[in-house]
Amino acid sequence: REKILSDVVWVIRRFQPDIIITRFPTTGEGGHGHHTASAILANEAFTAAADPNRFPDQLRYVQVWQTKRVLWNTFNFGGNNTTREDQFKVDVGGYNPLLGKSYGEIAAESRSQHKSQGFGVPSSRGESLEYFKATKGDQPVNDLLDGITTSWNKIDEGPAVKKMVDSLVAGFDFLHPENSVKGLV
């Protein structure tokens, strides 16, 4: 248990996610034990990754990291409905005009390739709500990224990067997008 927890803590400290989303609950109704274990480990690692006394040998290579929240993506599947109206909701049913498909259609195509578990389902368009419940940290209210800095100020070199990006955007030529390559490289 400690070895796999150490691995999960390493990943959190290495990649420093602001949010962790689990697909399965910690209580077992999400299917087999691997599903439950993944949720339990994510919640334990949330706390352990921020604690310098947990897996201190890792700190030669990474630093402690406090993720803002762990969200469980609740579900209504197989007669088991864990969604509630007071949970945070995100509409994932948008349409991508560049791809000519809705995200529901893309998801259905991907599930149709998971042949070993019979996940093929009809595609759908239109509103499709996903529900989230905070299991660690705070529950978002207005946006999945509530309370999280999403500007370039989040990183040390951020102001310089922002200045460069702003300059590229201001000088972008829709007729000659290739002119931006040098600045991007």
Place the predicted regions along the sequence by residue:
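Active-site beta-strand->loop->alpha-helix modules in alpha/beta enzyme cores, enriched
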Residues: R1-F55, N76-F77
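The feature marks non-catalytic terminal segments
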Residues: A48-V185
